[in-house]
């Protein structure tokens, strides 16, 4: 089963209406559509699919927690398996945020590059940057139909995640807040011990060149607001500039982790939300864009019960 998102259809209908009819109709903002979504349009995120990173408190003593949702199968599972092992071994405890590059990424891991990795980490091949198409009957791939993609044949959503699609298959895309695996030059693909998150304009040129393993769903402000590094590529040059990481745990092994849920991308509510993101017709906007980059349709995520 496939669900297509009519990003252009409603704009065309609206353009054909008399001015008086258009003025008489009010269009909800994307946030209003999300707020009105039915309870069963929301999908719970399992605690076992959450990575909780606690940073050292800020200069005012306030705690800083970053919550990351890991990608579901079949995407990037070799690296995600490594991340689970690293978290279980408490490997990130005592490491740090080492790089903050403006309009690009925040990166964390072992700044010394000397800390021993736990045994049993997988070596994952670059072929796993892309997932071959699996049978249509096993998936719902909601396409943002009609909106061109500069980096792929098409794009859409599966299970709450933005994906691009080409002849070779499907792959996750570098939108704001996505989390990826740092690596050296090919054929190295990284273990998952060095991670980064996007804090700027979506660097889609990295798609299929680096493994994406998740996205920040809460607390990205604790990283995006950090002082920019002054070294090459935004690395911190002094040890005291680095932000200590107190702990990283899988959600069901961490304390005081709230429940999270995302708006199902195969729901009618999400289809309406995506259309509204592509064709803004609420009060502030005079000219609907008639389309949207996939990274401009962020999947709504909230604390359960909010």
How should each PLM-predicted stretch be described?
Residues 21-306:
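Cyclophilin-like peptidyl-prolyl cis-trans isomerases
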Residues 6-16:
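Bacterial N-terminal signal peptides
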Residues 1-4:
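Positively charged n-region of N-terminal signal peptides that target proteins for export
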């Amino acid at each position: 089963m496939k669900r297509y998102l009519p990003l252009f259809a409603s704009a065309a209908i609206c353009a054909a209406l008399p001015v008086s009819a258009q003025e008489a109709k009010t269009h909800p903002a994307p946030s209003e559509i999300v707020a009105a979504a039915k309870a069963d349009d929301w999908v719970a995120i399992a605690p076992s699919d959450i990575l909780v990173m606690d940073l050292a408190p800020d200069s005012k003593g306030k705690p800083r927690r970053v919550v990351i949702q890991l990608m579901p199968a079949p995407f990037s599972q070799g690296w995600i398996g490594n991340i689970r092992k690293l978290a279980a071994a408490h490997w990130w405890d005592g490491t740090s945020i080492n790089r903050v590059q403006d309009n690009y990424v925040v990166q964390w891991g072992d700044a010394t590059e000397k800390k021993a990795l736990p045994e049993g980490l997988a070596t994952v091949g670059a072929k796993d940057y892309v997932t071959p198409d699996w049978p249509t009957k096993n998936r719902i791939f909601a396409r943002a139909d009609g909106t061109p993609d500069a980096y792929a044949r098409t794009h859409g959503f599966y299970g709450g995640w933005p994906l691009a699609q080409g002849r070779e298959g499907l792959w996750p895309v570098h939108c704001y807040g996505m989390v990826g695996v740092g690596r050296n030059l090919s054929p190295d693909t990284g273990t998952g011990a060095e991670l980064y998150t996007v804090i700027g304009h979506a660097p889609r040129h990295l798609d299929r060149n680096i493994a994406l393993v998740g996205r920040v769903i809460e607390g990205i402000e604790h990283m995006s607001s950090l002082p920019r590094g002054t070294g090459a590529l935004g690395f911190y040059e002094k040890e005291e500039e680095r932000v200590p990481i107190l702990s990283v745990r899988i959600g069901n092994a961490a304390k005081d982790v709230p429940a999270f849920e995302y708006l199902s991308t195969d729901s009618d509510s999400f289809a309406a939300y995506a259309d509204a993101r592509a064709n803004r017709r609420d009060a502030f906007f005079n000219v609907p864009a008639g389309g949207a980059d996939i990274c401009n349709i962020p999947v709504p995520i909230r604390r359960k019960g909010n």
